[in-house]
Amino acid sequence: MDESGRQRPASHVAADISPQGAHRRSFKAWLASYIHSLSRRASGRPSGPSPRDGAVSGARPGSRRRSSFRERLRAGLSRWRVSRSSRRRSSPEAPGPAAKLRRPPLRRSETAMTSPPSPPSHILSLARIHKLCIPVFAVNPALRYTTLEIPGARSFGGSGGYGEVQLIREHKLAVKTIREKEWFAVELVATLLVGECALRGGRTHDIRGFITPLGFSLQQRQIVFPAYDMDLGKYIGQLASLRATTPSVATALHHCFTDLARAVVFLNTRCGISHLDIKCANVLVMLRSDAVSLRPAVLADFSLVTLNSNSTISRGQFCLQEPDLESPRGFGMPAALTTANFHTLVGHGYNQPPELSVKYLNNERAEFNNRPLKHDVGLAVDLYALGQTLLELLVSVYVAPSLGVPVTRVPGYQYFNNQLSPDFAVALLAYRCVLHPALFVNSAETNTHGLAYDVPEGIRRHLRNPKIRRAFTEQCINYQRTHKAVLSSVSLPPELRPLLVLVSRLCHANPAARHSLS
């Protein structure tokens, strides 16, 4: 009769005994029992002498000398050890089905990414509300992987202050690896937040201006994104070399940057998140079939993302369910995402609005240090930076070729130790007072909140230090001598007017005019 498939019921008596078939008995229990038996012997109760006791005590056969308590204890301990070892040798088989592990295995199951992942339907979901004001978000467990084992050649995609990017062109994937563990936690949370906002914005407002993650690895400190053709900086160089300035290119550019402006307003206002690092390298583009016109672009690189005053999740927490763990792993909102940092806001100064440069020169930083970022400040910074990226394209592709002179958007890349210097801030403000009036549109649609461009008198009036005011005045005079005559001869095709109007509104000297885009 075959009984290989049978099992004992849980109530069987064998479930209460050891796998060796005998009742488990600890040494402590045995010692207590043995001492109790010795006390009974000492009380005068008859007990026959043991040959083993005599052998251990060293007494001669037939001797009536009574062994000491220590000798009897040693003999009993020896018998207990012998009996225990004999039971182990007689039952070498493994524990049966009744024996179960009381803890999870030490080695967790591996989840390697072996094929290109599909875009997620969601990234975060509200799990519960803790203490009435702390939302706890569950991270989509399908995004997590341990190792990246997708076949295909890797190529260098770029590097920055926090990590580098590798491209897998065969599968249209980009893998970003963060160097530092602390910065990986910050960027991962920021990427998950912006990614969820991007998915919700696409469903409810048809806003698709942000890159969404496809997966992440805590062990490798990696985040996987869809790969794009190139960034905006490379596209500007390619467009300038091809000299492909057809009306269709200008129309596609206008649609692209209008959508990006809507996305920036949505992120800052509805989501309470400010990007704070919009530049050509962080705008990723896809080309149409003609290889020159743009498809809708996206913003990437959320290393400097900060929650602004419109955010309701600054105290939020996150939980991630991992394999073989009963309870999910929890982690809170990184402090770097919840407070403003003046150094982060100013950066190198290339794309920052004039009001920030003036505050930098006046040393007015108290309102930004260790305080929540104001929504209107974050929105004004992001919109101005987006306008500067568009202005970079217009100057490099249209203005400089039409003049035959290498005119640039900024006076030069002058900074020390990756920080903005006062000399460069003064030069940048003065240079914009000459460049912007030559390119910005001066009309009713751009002058609702005053002139769209900065004038020297307005900047000079806000500078407190007399020495800095004199330096600014001298720089304005110098740039007017070297650039004003050249820029006065700029002649751009009429199809660029919508782009120039958009630049004038995005880079308006009055922050309130930028807010009106929302």
Curated annotation (Swiss-Prot):
Record-listed ATP binding positions: G157, G158, S159, G160, G161, Y162, G163, E164, V165, K176
Positions annotated as active site in the UniProt record: D277 (proton acceptor)
Additional free-text comment from the UniProt record: Displays a substrate specificity similar to host CDC2.
Signal sequence interval, chain numbering: none
Keyword Lipid biosynthesis included in the entry's annotation: no
UniProt subcellular location: Virion tegument; Host nucleus
Catalysed conversion reaction: L-seryl-[protein] + ATP = O-phospho-L-seryl-[protein] + ADP + H(+); L-threonyl-[protein] + ATP = O-phospho-L-threonyl-[protein] + ADP + H(+)
Protein name, as recorded: Serine/threonine-protein kinase UL13
Residue span, Protein kinase domain: 151-518
Compositionally biased spans, kind Low complexity: 44-61
Family: Belongs to the protein kinase superfamily. Ser/Thr protein kinase family.
Enzyme nomenclature, EC number: 2.7.11.1
Function: Multifunctional serine/threonine kinase that plays a role in several processes including egress of virus particles from the nucleus, modulation of the actin cytoskeleton and regulation of viral and cellular gene expression. Regulates the nuclear localization of viral envelopment factors UL34 and UL31, by phosphorylating the US3 kinase, indicating a role in nuclear egress. Disrupts host nuclear lamins, including LMNA and LMNB1. Phosphorylates the viral Fc receptor composed of glycoproteins E (gE) and I (gI).
Enzyme class: transferase
GO molecular function ontology, one term from the record: protein serine/threonine kinase activity
Gene Ontology cellular-component terms listed: host cell nucleus; viral tegument
Keywords of the record: ATP-binding, Host nucleus, Host-virus interaction, Kinase, Nucleotide-binding, Serine/threonine-protein kinase, Transferase, Virion, Virion tegument
Post-translational modification: Autophosphorylated.
Coiled coil: none
Keyword flag Glycosyltransferase: no
Organism of origin: Human herpesvirus 2 (strain HG52) (HHV-2)
Residue segments, region Disordered: 1-22, 39-120
